[in-house]
From Swiss-Prot:
This is Cyclotide vibi-G. One of its GO terms (biological process) is defense response. Disulfide bonds join 5-21, 9-23, 14-28. InterPro entries: Cyclotide, Cyclotide_bracelet_CS, Cyclotide_sf. Belongs to the cyclotide family. Bracelet subfamily. The keyword Membrane does not apply. It comes from Viola biflora.
Length: 31
């Protein structure tokens, strides 16, 4: 939840979830 993964998740899920990122406020964050 602290480090932006440089990915948006407005229309599609976070592809970066493979490395531990999750969607928050339309942006993918790690931790």
């Amino acid at each position: 939840g602290t480090f932006p993964c440089g990915e948006s998740c407005v229309f599609i899920p976070c592809l970066t979830s493979a490395i531990g990122c999750s969607c928050k406020s339309k942006v993918c964050y790690k931790n």
